[in-house]
Curated annotation (Swiss-Prot):
Residues 24-54 are annotated as: Disordered. Pathway: Amine and polyamine biosynthesis; betaine biosynthesis via choline pathway; betaine aldehyde from choline (monooxygenase route): step 1/1. Its EC number is 1.14.15.7. This is Choline monooxygenase, chloroplastic. It catalyses: choline + 2 reduced [2Fe-2S]-[ferredoxin] + O2 + 2 H(+) = betaine aldehyde hydrate + 2 oxidized [2Fe-2S]-[ferredoxin] + H2O. GO terms for molecular function: 2 iron, 2 sulfur cluster binding; choline monooxygenase activity; iron ion binding.
């Protein structure tokens, strides 16, 4: 449990600049602003999480149902499918949602509109834009976004699309004084304003106010940068509460830790619907003794506790006192908070990990895992590498499970399943939230 040496840190942080369109916090381009704005950054730095102030910055037993087909993708057919799951049925008697929730392209599109384009979604971490003129890019569904901090320190978010001919404006992350479109050379300030329309004549009267980048709502909450397409969100609201409800303080107590330092990112593409991973995460470790043999030795399952609070499920479990190899990764207790629909914050031992599942299609997603560790452990290269290796292996095992479930859902043999209570109460709660959000 120590801080990694410079060489160890460099070795740990050699990862791609983007992860499924989401920026890698370990990459940073500090080239001169006069360089090509859209060159993919190559330099890497080790971001920290020193700024933890919750700063708010906002811009502008029933019979198995029969399931309808979405061959004709009308709003009524989608809603019919949404209502095939009834949240009023007690979980002991209920069937799980129909397999079509996990396979139909039209249902996936409906999820993007009703879930991912509403409320707050994690876009990146605050250290990516801790300095003026830093920026990063990413994607959410078919939305390409750009987050920047201008020269005066204000944070902005925009659709990453040039207002001239719809070219993607920037890529990767880094530090620049302006954004230059790679197509026709239009120039935008770090605040999204149009600074120059190349070769445009003054008599055309192109209005810079009308041709600036299209803004998104943005907020910084502790280590997380969040964005929103939701126009119903009020300016200046309590971002933590809007995102996490009454669980915000509990999550804040674990995640807003100034001793934590970002050290590594892992990514796991998988051929499965994003909800399969969410379901897997929320089963109160029901699958762990069968699928994760080493991980099972780290936990005392008799102490497992699951609480569902609004749009968050929190799981707590004590670490096992009998560790076969003597390696203590989990510590006294593990805390797992899963914020619906797709983001988890975990604290255990000296670690914090975040798990972000990115929907990429009805049958495809990517898991991005960010690792943080307490400063006192940064020099312990062996501990860090072993801890990351153990957790990465757990995720690879879960990828196999999720892809297997997706294949099973695609077969004509399966329409829906049943819940095993109370261990799967977290999954049932998530499904109820989905139905209420989608209807």
């Amino acid at each position: 449990m120590m801080a990694a040496s410079a060489s160890a840190t460099t070795m740990l942080l050699k990862y791609p600049t983007t992860v499924c369109g989401i920026p890698n916090p370990s990459s940073n381009n500090n080239n001169d602003p006069s360089n090509n704005i859209v060159s993919i950054p190559q330099n890497t730095t080790n971001p920290t999480l020193k700024s933890r102030t919750p700063n708010k910055i906002t811009t502008n037993a029933v019979a198995a149902p029969s399931f309808p087909s979405l061959t004709t993708t009308t709003p009524s057919s989608i809603q019919s499918l949404v209502h095939e799951f009834d949240p009023q049925i007690p979980p002991e008697d209920a069937h799980t949602p129909p397999s079509s929730w996990y396979t139909e392209p039209a249902f996936y599109s409906h999820e993007l509109e009703r879930i991912f384009y509403k409320g707050w979604q994690v876009a990146g971490i605050s250290d990516q834009i801790k300095e003026p003129n830093q920026y990063f890019t990413g994607s959410l569904g078919n939305v390409e976004y750009l987050v920047s901090r201008d020269g005066e320190g204000k944070v902005h978010a925009f659709h990453n699309v040039c207002t001239h001919r719809a070219s993607i404006l920037a890529c990767g992350s880094g530090k620049k004084s302006c954004f230059v479109c790679p197509y026709h050379g239009w120039v935008y300030g770090m605040d999204g304003s149009l600074a120059k329309a190349s070769k445009a004549k003054p008599e055309q009267n192109l209005d810079p106010k009308e041709l600036g980048l299209v803004p998104l709502k943005v907020a910084v909450w502790g280590p997380f940068v969040l964005i929103s397409l939701d126009r119903s969100l009020e300016e200046g609201g309590d971002v933590g509460t809007e995102w996490l409800g009454t669980s915000a303080e509990d999550v804040k107590a674990h995640a807003f830790d100034p001793s934590l330092q970002f050290i590594h990112r892992s990514e796991f593409p998988m051929e499965s619907n994003w909800k399969i991973f969410s379901d897997n995460y929320l089963d109160s470790s029901y699958h762990v003794p069968y699928a994760h043999k080493y991980y099972a030795t780290e936990l005392n399952f008799d102490t497992y506790d699951t609480q569902m609070i609004e749009n968050v499920t929190i799981q707590r479990v004590e670490g096992s006192s009998n560790k076969p190899d003597g390696f203590d990764r989990v510590g006294i207790q593990a805390f797992y908070a899963f914020a619906y629909p797709n983001f988890a914050v975990e604290r255990y031992g000296p670690w914090m990990t975040t798990m972000h599942i990115h929907p990429l299609g009805p049958r495809k997603c990517k898991l991005v895992v960010d690792y943080y560790i307490e400063n006192s452990m940064l020099d312990d290269k062996d501990y860090i590498e072993k801890g990351i290796a153990i957790n990465d292996n757990v995720q690879r095992e879960d990828v196999v499970l999720c892809e297997s479930v997706q294949r099973g859902l695609e077969t004509p043999a399966y329409r829906s399943g049943r819940y095993v209570m109370p261990i799967e109460k977290g999954i049932h709660h998530f499904h109820c939230w989905l139905q209420q959000t989608l209807k």
